[in-house]
């Protein structure tokens, strides 16, 4: 297993709205800076709470997310890795697949190997901010 595998697990667990599988790729002491709703999440329990709320909302709205990674750069050593990329989240109606909306965020994932398994120990998502109005710029990609 390499660090790329973690990104594929991230992508498929979101699409399947599988909370347990999604949080299984994170270290118990993960520290996340998220650009949605919460400034940060410290520890797996806090992150799992946020993810559960997110996936429940998707299910209630009858939506699935398709995740796509662009411009992925991964640096990997024997026990540490980092990846940075653009991540597009496209919401689709579960019933007929109609695309509803999409956004692209910038992401950095920092991983460490624990007992031959890569785990995300730090994640940072961001958007550029408009200098004119101070709002996140969603449509640049």
PLM feature spans:
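A solvent-exposed, acidic/Ser-Thr-rich amphipathic alpha-helical stretch
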Residues: 6, 19-79, 86
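Generic hydrophobic alpha-helical segments
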Residues: 9-10
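Short, surface-exposed coil-to-beta transition loops
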Residues: 67-69, 84, 102-107
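Generic short beta-strand segments
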Residues: 85-92
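Outer-membrane beta-barrel domain signature
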Residues: 97-98
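Short beta-strand edge/turn micro-motifs at domain boundaries
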Residues: 102-135
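Extended, polar beta-sheet/loop recognition surfaces of beta-rich domains
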Residues: 139-141
């Amino acid at each position: 297993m390499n660090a790329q595998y973690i990104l594929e697990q991230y992508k498929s667990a979101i699409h399947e709205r599988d909370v347990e599988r999604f949080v299984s790729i994170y270290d118990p002491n993960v520290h996340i800076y998220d650009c949605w709703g919460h400034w940060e999440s410290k520890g797996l329990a806090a992150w799992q709470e946020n993810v559960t709320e997110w996936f429940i909302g998707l299910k209630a709205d009858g939506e699935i997310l398709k995740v796509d990674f662009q411009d992925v750069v991964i640096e990997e050593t024997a026990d540490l890795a980092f990846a940075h990329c653009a991540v597009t989240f496209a919401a689709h109606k579960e019933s007929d697949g109609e695309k509803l909306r999409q956004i692209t965020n910038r992401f950095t994932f920092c991983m460490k190997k624990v007992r031959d398994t890569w785990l995300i120990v730090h994640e940072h998502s961001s958007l550029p901010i408009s200098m004119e109005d101070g709002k996140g710029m969603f449509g640049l990609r």
